[in-house]
Swiss-Prot record:
HAMAP family noted in UniProt: Ribosomal_uL1_B
Protein name: Large ribosomal subunit protein uL1
Superkingdom, taxonomy of origin: Bacteria
MF (Gene Ontology): rRNA binding; structural constituent of ribosome; tRNA binding
Family affiliation: Belongs to the universal ribosomal protein uL1 family.
InterPro entries per UniProt: Ribosom_uL1_bac-type, Ribosomal_uL1, Ribosomal_uL1-like, Ribosomal_uL1/biogenesis, Ribosomal_uL1_3-a/b-sand, Ribosomal_uL1_CS
Keywords: Repressor, Ribonucleoprotein, Ribosomal protein, RNA-binding, rRNA-binding, Translation regulation, tRNA-binding
Length: 231
């Protein structure tokens, strides 16, 4: 415990919780306080000016990060015929219909994203209690129920992140790894914030993007001054 306490004291001495850091400085600081032996993810939290208790203010969607997330993404697709062929060609690891549903029911789910063509939802709909709790249930609002399954596969492979506002009005997602360059992380953050602005509910009034903070997997949050970003 003493080691953890010492580390936290050192980190606290380097980070001013009241300060909003310029983006590049925030990423440099994030790397500086990272002391674990694995390559941490860079996570971002965005506080939005919405009331998620109201259905017309629930912000959800997806963003394709220009520099990816640094993660290898395995994709499963529910489709048949030409759509299934297109999904395989796009790089999907698993493609099927009833046979894939049977594997899911057995607990064989070696994939990170599930995509479905609209005509496959009669099969996928039966898997809600299995896929839903794992955050894998396809949904048209985030582009995982689509006629163009090949594009959805390519987007997922390229580093698409999905987001949904939580009960506190905050979006949590990842924008890369600590070994990304600051420019790459900045571009990813800009893309995410741009997409969040596009997803602003019409009924949302006042300041929409209220606060942005970044952190590594095991690190503390660092407040970011996003006023100079290209969003």
């Amino acid at each position: 415990m003493a080691k953890v306490s010492k580390r936290m004291k050192e980190i606290s001495a380097k980070i001013n919780a009241e300060k909003k850091y310029p983006v590049s400085e925030a990423f440099d600081l994030l790397r500086e306080v990272s002391s674990v032996k694995f390559v941490e993810s860079v996570d971002v939290s965005v506080a939005l000016g919405v009331d998620p208790r109201k259905s017309d203010q629930v912000v959800r969607g997806a963003s394709v990060l220009p520099n990816g997330t640094g993660k290898t993404v395995r994709v499963a697709v529910f489709a048949k015929g030409p759509a299934a062929d297109a999904a395989k060609e796009a790089g999907a690891e698993v493609v099927g219909m009833e046979d894939l549903a049977d594997e899911v029911k057995k607990g064989n789910m070696d994939f990170d994203v599930v995509i479905a063509s609209p005509d496959s939802m009669r099969v996928v709909g039966q898997l809600g209690q299995i896929l839903g709790p794992k955050g894998l249930m396809p949904n048209p609002k985030v582009g995982t129920v689509t006629m163009d399954v090949a594009k959805a596969v390519r987007d997922a492979k390229a580093g698409q992140v999905r987001y949904r506002v939580d009960k506190a009005g905050i979006i949590h997602t990842t924008i890369g790894k600590v070994n990304f360059t600051s420019d790459a992380l900045k571009q990813n953050l800009e893309q995410l914030l741009t997409d969040l602005k596009k997803a602003k509910p019409a009924v949302s009034k006042g300041i929409y993007l209220k606060k942005v903070s970044v952190s590594s997997t095991m690190g503390p949050g660092i407040n970011v001054d996003f006023s100079d970003l290209n969003i």
